[in-house]
UniProtKB/Swiss-Prot annotation:
Native species: Variola virus (isolate Human/India/Ind3/1967) (VARV)
Family of this protein: Belongs to the ribonucleoside diphosphate reductase small chain family.
Name of the featured protein: Ribonucleoside-diphosphate reductase small chain
Superkingdom, taxonomy of origin: Viruses
UniProtKB keywords: Deoxyribonucleotide synthesis, Early protein, Iron, Metal-binding, Oxidoreductase
SUPFAM superfamilies referenced in this protein's UniProt entry, alphabetically: Ferritin-like
A single GO BP: deoxyribonucleotide biosynthetic process
Necessary cofactors: Fe cation
Function: Ribonucleoside-diphosphate reductase holoenzyme provides the precursors necessary for viral DNA synthesis. Allows virus growth in non-dividing cells. Catalyzes the biosynthesis of deoxyribonucleotides from the corresponding ribonucleotides.
Subunit structure: Interacts with RNR1/OPG080 subunit. Can interact with host RNR1 supunit.
């Protein structure tokens, strides 16, 4: 039995802190709290109306995936992780993560509701995990792991792959729109959400390091390569990023690069041994995600929750 999963009679009380590294992650998550009302999407409609049909199609499908995916992550937290993990510090993080995932889901739903006026199309997008095969494939993979009989360690890797791999390509595509000066509300919310998800992925890696009996390297590699294949298909075949003017081969390589960063953070050898295909994408890769958070994306962080020097993070890099 893993110590972090063993029955803990002190789980109802926070102090004294036993796992300071896990507690520090919780405090970072707490400092990142934001709400959808703080994101101004009023200027997006003008840009939306200027987009090509291909660009609109791409953005709608990405938002449809995101709108459902956060609910899947939350179902896993509620049904499995929050019940299994017995240490208070991790439960604090997971509880806060659930609140943040709700905000993400609300944000994506609001964006769809704002951009798409036809009620039938809205319903189609809101029900993407049933109506869109390309989204359903990703959703089915994630949901499979909620109910899988595998141990906590394997499922921890699977959901690190969901948040670290399934999300990264879509984040990159929205950052590409920011580079073009489009959709300020969408792109600002993307900065906040990608920061949050980076922290969630970092937390999964931290929890993995607390396991005394982690899954084998072979098992970890299998889960991650499976996720990479699904995501590559999603963004280069089912919903090709060429629709918004990005290079599909570069996106494929980027997904492999992200996977290498993730497995390296977990303490294993890289799988693909590729370099980052673009300086632009360096800003949103997994490495340094916690630092990315600390630099206060969009100059946003709760005052006084964490003491940090002011840093200015720029995404204005040639792609």
């Amino acid at each position: 039995m893993e110590p972090i999963l063993a029955k803990n009679p002190n789980r109802f009380v926070i102090f004294p802190i036993q796992y300071h590294d896990i507690w520090n992650m919780y405090k970072k998550a707490e400092a990142s709290f934001w709400t959808v009302e703080e994101v101004d999407i009023s200027k997006d409609i003008n840009d939306w109306n200027k987009l090509t049909p291909d660009e609109k199609y791409f953005i709608k499908h990405v938002l449809a995936f995101f709108a459902a995916s956060d609910g899947i992550v939350n179902e896993n937290l509620a049904e499995r992780f929050c019940i299994e993990v017995q240490i208070t510090e991790a439960r604090c993080f997971y509880g806060f993560q659930m609140a943040i995932e709700n905000i993400h889901s609300e944000m994506y739903s609001l964006l769809i509701d704002t951009y798409v006026k036809d009620s039938n199309e809205k319903n189609y997008l809101f029900n993407a995990i049933e109506t869109m095969p390309c989204v359903k494939k990703k959703a089915d993979w994630a949901q499979k792991w909620i109910h899988d009989s595998a141990g906590y360690g394997e499922r921890l890797i699977a959901f690190a792959a969901v948040e670290g791999i399934f999300f990264s390509g879509s984040f990159a595509s929205i950052f590409w729109l920011k580079k073009r000066g489009l959709m300020p509300g969408l792109t600002f919310s993307n900065e906040l959400i990608s920061r949050d998800e980076g922290l969630h992925c970092d937390f999964a890696c931290l929890m993995f390091k607390h396991l005394l009996y982690p899954p084998s390297e072979e098992t970890v590699r299998s889960i991650i390569t499976d996720a990479v294949s699904i995501e590559q298909e999603f963004l280069t075949v089912a919903l090709p990023v060429k629709l918004i003017g990005m290079n599909c081969e570069m996106m494929k390589t980027y997904m492999e690069f992200v996977a290498d960063r993730l497995i390296s953070e977990l303490g294993f050898k890289r799988i693909y041994n590729v370099t980052n295909p673009s300086d632009f994408m360096e800003n949103i890769s997994l490495e340094g995600k916690t630092n990315f958070f600390e630099k206060r994306v969009g100059e946003y962080q709760k005052m006084g929750v964490m003491s940090q020097e002011d840093n200015h993070f720029s995404l204005d890099v040639d792609f």
